[in-house]
Amino acid sequence: MSELSPHSPFSVTELNRQVRRLLEVSFMQVWVTGEISNFSCPSSGHWYFSLKDDKAQVRCAMFRNRNMFVKQRPRDGEAVTLRAKVSLYEGRGEFQLIAESMELAGEGELRRAFEELKLKLSREGLFEESRKRPLPAMPKQVGVITSPTGAAVRDILTVLERRFPAIPVLLFPVPVQGKEAGPAIVAAIASANRLNCCDVLIVGRGGGSLEDLWAFNEEPVARAIAASAIPVVSAVGHETDITIADLVADLRAPTPSAAAEKVSPDQAEWKHRFLIYEQRLDAAAQRLLRQEGLRLNQLRGRLKHPGRRLQESAQRLDDLEVRLHRQAQNLLSVRRNQLTHLRDRLLASSPRQSLKNRYATVDALNHRLQTAVLSVLRHKSQHFAKLCGHMEAVSPIATLARGYAIVSDENGQIIRSEKEVRTGQKVKARLSDGEIHCEVVASV
């Protein structure tokens, strides 16, 4: 913001613009609770009102693209909580709040409790699609758990009467609002399961505020729905109302009327389906009659006189007898030839000749083995003698035998040079046949 100067004053428009920007930057978003007053809604659809407490008030605006998400239009005197941006209406220089969301005061705690329970049950898997059961195509009886005096039960009965009046309905009357509602709904679900006379249950009520619908957000109600052996359709409030019961139920219907549509077959559709089945059955029966008539005519044409059938059978029997006799003779001849052939092969392969040949083979192998062993022994003896000669040639004993001696000092250390001895030193000389002890007289 530029510095204040009498030579460069702000215009009113510029001042309001600067103040608006400063407010919007300083207060990004605030939550404010107060009482509605001076509420108005012109044809534009925007809401204008004041929010006040016992000491102050502030002008507020909530544009149509935001207020369309508020469940019901507020009235003067209602306490609400706003999420808003702080701003300034430049045209009048009027400080105001631009509301982003609105809920009745006290609904914030309920909404937090709703989110906590929703997270808890979600982690337990109660919202999983895999645990939800299909509804029966043709229920024998529909159970309805709702208020007996509300609009919901009238809507449900009207739809069921229109779609399929033959389906009986069993009403479990319960309060749907207040502290008694939750336990009553739980007890009704338990009763329906205990009676076990309904194929599907509708649990619901008409629309209302979050507080009005709270019984359907209570944990015992959610767990009763999840534990029900009978499939449950939840129909709470309007389409925009989502409760914990909706998330746990096997099917969520946006309204009680829609729930009745979901659980009941369409009578007209079933009549049409039965008509189609009747036509198909009649056509199939006519087709079968024609086919069997043709088959009967064919069989009638093929049917012969019994005497002729007997003659043909007797002739066929004689023919079979001749063929059987001929085949028996052929089989005997074949078996006789096979027996002769086997006898000749047995004589040709006598075990006496085979044993004789085996003995000759063993004798030959034994002779070859003895010859090989003697040859190996001679070769190894010659090689050993040669190795002994080589070892004898390089042996120190052989060297001593040629007149050499190995001289060592008193400690047994070999003396290799005359520099390693001194005059008068005792030494030993090893010869080929013993040792002699000597004394060094001189070294040259």
UniProtKB/Swiss-Prot annotation:
Main location: cytoplasm
Domain of life: Bacteria
EC numbers, comma separated: 3.1.11.6
GO terms, molecular function: exodeoxyribonuclease VII activity; nucleic acid binding
Entry GO terms, CC: cytoplasm; exodeoxyribonuclease VII complex
GO BP annotation list: DNA catabolic process
Subcellular location: Cytoplasm
EC main group: hydrolase
Reaction catalyzed: Exonucleolytic cleavage in either 5'- to 3'- or 3'- to 5'-direction to yield nucleoside 5'-phosphates
This protein's UniProt keywords: Cytoplasm, Exonuclease, Hydrolase, Nuclease
Recorded family membership: Belongs to the XseA family.
NCBIfam families (alphabetical): xseA
Function of the protein: Bidirectionally degrades single-stranded DNA into large acid-insoluble oligonucleotides, which are then degraded further into small acid-soluble oligonucleotides.
Subunit structure, as described in the record: Heterooligomer composed of large and small subunits.
Protein name stated in the entry: Exodeoxyribonuclease 7 large subunit
Originating gene: xseA
